[in-house]
């Protein structure tokens, strides 16, 4: 028994820090539909589903989420347009995506994160997301091994701060304001959409000095940071 306890303790010491990688997750499609590489983004200020209270003073302790997220519409593959630096993404040089698929047994949402390293090496991580409440706008995500996910640790908060009405673009961040991702169904969005989401992030209190755009193989639009 002592040997088992010691083994488990060592495993936890190694594995639990990996839970921070869950912030690298991106939002569940009716499994994903085919996305075009052509820029078809028509997001405007009016189509962004933003709660009025989300426009808060940046000194507020926590950001505000959208009122609701339909997880079936939210499912599928998302391209990372840009992000704040994150340790567990330090080896991702380009082509960052996240695919969400609802589990048939209703136990949660499978999250598959992928990216390409500096030398073109494929990097993949699999995790499990669960809604934190009935709005769907807050997810608890874990990348711990399945045999240890029952522990009440290693789950990162993943909040949808803004999205458009068609679930084509979304802004996701952590409540401590350390991490932030701009996501889209296509690797291309307009400069107008990019600027609007940056504005929302700043109004929510996120520091964007280190925000970086993500290179995608099929990008045809060069955004101005």
Task: Give the residues covered by each predicted segment.
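A beta-rich soluble binding module of mature secreted/lumenal proteins
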Residues: 2-10, 17-225
């Amino acid at each position: 028994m002592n040997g088992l306890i010691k083994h488990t303790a060592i495993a936890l010491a190694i594995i639990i820090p990996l839970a921070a990688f869950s912030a690298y997750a991106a939002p569940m499609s009716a499994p994903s539909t085919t996305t075009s590489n052509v820029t078809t983004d028509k997001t405007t200020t009016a189509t962004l589903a933003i709660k009025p209270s989300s426009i808060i003073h940046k000194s507020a302790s926590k950001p505000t989420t959208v009122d609701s997220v339909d997880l079936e519409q939210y499912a599928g593959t998302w391209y990372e347009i840009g992000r704040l630096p994150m340790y567990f993404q330090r080896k991702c040089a380009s082509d960052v995506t996240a695919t969400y698929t609802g589990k048939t047994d209703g136990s949660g949402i499978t999250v598959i994160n992928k990216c390409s390293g500096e030398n073109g090496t494929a990097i993949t991580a699999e995790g499990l997301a669960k809604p934190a409440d009935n709005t769907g706008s807050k997810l608890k995500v874990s990348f711990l091994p399945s045999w240890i996910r029952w522990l009440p640790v290693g789950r990162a908060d993943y909040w949808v701060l803004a999205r458009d009405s068609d679930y084509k673009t979304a802004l996701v961040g952590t409540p401590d304001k350390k991490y932030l991702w701009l996501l889209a169904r296509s690797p291309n969005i307009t400069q107008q959409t990019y600027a609007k989401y940056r504005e929302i992030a700043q109004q929510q209190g996120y520091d964007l000095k280190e925000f970086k755009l993500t290179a995608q193989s099929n990008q045809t639009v060069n955004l101005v940071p």
